[in-house]
Regions:
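Active-site Asp-x-Gly
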Residues: 62, 220-224, 229-287
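An alpha-helical support segment within catalytic cores of ATP-dependent transferases
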Residues: 5-21, 108, 132-141, 145-224, ...
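Short Gly/Pro-enriched turn/cap motifs at secondary-structure boundaries
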Residues: 28-30, 224
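ATP-binding pocket architecture of kinase catalytic cores
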Residues: 31, 35, 42-166, 170
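Conserved N-terminal boundary motif of the eukaryotic protein kinase catalytic domain
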Residues: 21-28
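ATP/Mg2+ or Mg2+-diphosphate-binding catalytic cores
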Residues: 189-199, 293-327
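Short strand-connecting beta-turns/loops that link adjacent beta-strands
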Residues: 45-47, 108, 237-239, 287-290
């Protein structure tokens, strides 16, 4: 793992996308990606000063086991096909995503799936909260409208967009059972790695099953990003939110999205909240998500993920939060 692309590797991508008239002036690998490489390419000549290259290469996917079962909404997802399917669906509902300039998944000229997209240079919403709060607040309110469009775009089945687009059927019988089954696996895994979880394992198991028993079935699901934090929202020059890291886009219980939004946006979540969410689902999904954010980062740390201190901090925070949810 961790074999990043060099300027020489990316020059062919730029040449194929833009022609021979543009030359690379510099390359920066952007921080944060765990399933693909994201590179800002600075260019000489006329036209856009920079663009972004997504590179879905095995050596840039830090998750052990790489891609998972496509029918599992929670399995790691990577590649051009789910990216383009997600982008098409977001276009349909009116959510902004970076404009795609060129793609290739043949792996004949390039060793990975690649996409060239426009560079949204206004920074992340997360950064703007510190540097330009007024601009960030306006973008946050616009993001709330975008999420409302997505979450009210319903489907009769849950699952990843690329799977449903092909007529496939997602794993499991219901969102809530899928979440419970995953949470129990995460609990087992985390208990084997951390003594504090191991000590509370029985109580956490009982609590998860009790919360699941309160959930009433439903037959309609909203469109969710799945991992939407302020670091996954860019802000355009016009001040509009632009969603990135969209490969895991799926139809699911919107409560799952809201639990993650509340976790990642903290006190700013109030701008994104909405009435009508199901309290039993929120309770189950909150505990399940905290356990996932203990087990997942611990799994990631088995590899050579570079920002290890950051991952350890995620583990510690979510471990405390999970234990705090015990009665």
């Amino acid at each position: 793992m961790g074999g990043f692309a060099e300027a020489e590797d990316l020059s062919g991508v730029v040449s194929d996308a833009l022609g021979k008239r543009r030359r690379i002036a510099g390359v920066d690998r952007l921080r944060g990606g765990t399933k693909k490489g994201v590179y800002r390419i600075r260019l000489d000549g006329t036209g856009p000063a920079s663009l972004i290259v997504y590179r879905w290469a095995d050596e840039e996917n830090f998750w052990p086991g790489a891609a998972g079962e496509v029918t599992d909404p929670f399995a790691p997802v990577s590649g051009l096909v789910p990216f383009l399917a997600a982008r098409r669906r977001l276009d349909e509902v009116g959510a902004r995503v970076p404009r795609v300039l060129w793609t290739d998944d043949t792996r004949q000229r390039h060793a990975a799936d690649v996409a060239v997209v426009e560079d949204i240079t206004g920074g992340t919403l997360e950064a703007l909260f510190d540097t330009d709060p007024a601009r960030a607040d306006a973008a946050l309110n616009d993001l709330a409208r975008t999420l409302n469009l997505m979450h009210r775009h319903h489907a009769p089945r849950y699952g990843r967009v690329d799977l449903l687009e092909r007529g496939g059927v997602a794993l499991g019988d219901s969102c809530e059972q899928l979440v419970l089954d995953r949470a129990l696996r995460d609990l087992d895994e985390a208990a084997g790695r951390d003594t504090r979880i191991a000590a509370a394992r029985g109580r956490l198991d009982v609590r998860l099953r009790a919360l699941r028993a309160l959930v009433v079935p439903r037959t309609e699901y909203g469109l969710i990003h799945g991992e939407l934090g302020p670091d996954h929202v860019l802000v355009s020059a016009e001040g509009h939110p632009v969603l990135i890291d969209v490969e895991g886009l799926m139809y699911f219980d919107v409560e799952w999205e809201h639990v993650f939004l509340r976790l990642r946006f903290g006190e700013r979540y109030a701008a994104l909240s909405r009435p009508g969410l199901d309290p039993p689902r929120l309770g189950l999904y909150a505990l399940a998500m905290h356990l996932s954010l203990v087990a997942g980062p611990l799994r990631l740390l088995d590899g050579d993920f570079p920002d290890r201190e950051f991952m350890h901090a995620i583990v510690e925070h979510n471990l405390r939060e999970a234990l705090a949810l015990l009665p």
